Amino acid sequence: MFTQRNKVFLVTVLVVAVLFSLALVTMAKEYVPGTPLKVGFIYVGPIGDLGWSNAHDKARIICEDTFPWLETVYIESVAEGSEGLYIDKLIMEEGCDVVLTTSFGFMDGTLISAQKYPDKIFAHCSGFKRNPNLMTYMADFYQIYYLNGLIAGALTKTNKTAYIGAFPIPEVKRHMGAFAVGVRETKPKAEVHVRWIYEWFSPTAAKEAAEALIADGCDVFAFTEDSPTIVQVAGEKGLPSFGHYSPMYDFSPEYVVSGQIAHWEAVYLDFLAKVYAGAYTAHNLADVDYWWLLKEKAVEMGAKPGMLINPAYEDELKEKKVNDPVLGMISVYDLVMKRLEQMSDPSMVFDPFNGPVYDRDGNLKVPEGLRMSVFELTTIDWAVDGIVGPWE
């Protein structure tokens, strides 16, 4: 027999349950096109890293400044594997309509969350798993790493260039491979020596890796790590390097030759405008994959915006010649400019992974007359000829 206290308790429980259910319905409500849009970003590193996460956050700010109907929030320094908890926070507490996760290691957690919240819109950067409410996107640098490789091959005196990688995942292996293709094109006997640091942002590990490679005789540096540490360490030794993701010229003006600069805003502005207009919904994203390159202006080659190549290196690159099968005898400087023009053309008449391309064991991976598909590029796991060092 219920006492008055039991009845009050039961009513309280029922009221709480109803309110919680209503809250869930409200949070799960599908976005209505043309209404204010709230977007949450999840970053793997700190926004002050001056690399990957910093570039994404600059793009977020550009989007918010461009669209009066857009509100954004972000969470930084999220460990890969814990993204699901933060996605819950963005949806349950912040009320986000769209969640963008910006690291390869967030892929599985993002897919699980997309299935958990089928009425919300998700976008995952650098991955390949999609869902009706989950699209993928990438502003990829492999073309620019190839161009940087052309320059590195021309500049190395020891025939040992260096690439310090964060994690041995397809994205980084693709960039290393393109860099190696470029190096071998201008210096056939040169090598790309690899060190992994197993961190996206670790100035300490980056410094140790750079110093070890310098001790091994490497004299030109490329990398995937989200700080300017490597350009600073190389510069202190008078060695050239290439900036990564954000402009790094100011950290070593004499020795940053060029680099890769991301314009994530190109992707974000296009995607969010289409969500706002109703072109993209929580039901039609399974086949949406932004694979944006030079021709879409999602990436830029340069030591800093507007400076393709540091003027201090232009004369040396103009003096050094290579014999290209199609272009004939040409300076490295002119070759870089020609390849940049070709890859920026909408028809993209040249690609770094045009065959023949061999792996470092001598196996033909891309036959002559063919080029790697987007899927092959995004899942690459083999080392291009010329790469030296551990691969996992």
Question: What is the role of each PLM region?
Answer:
Residues T3, A28-E392:
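A residue-level marker of the well-folded mature domains of exported/periplasmic proteins
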Residues L22-A28:
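Juxtamembrane cytosolic interface motif at the C-terminal end of transmembrane helices
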Residues T12-S21:
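Bacterial N-terminal signal peptides
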Residues F2-V13:
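Bacterial N-terminal signal peptides that target proteins for export
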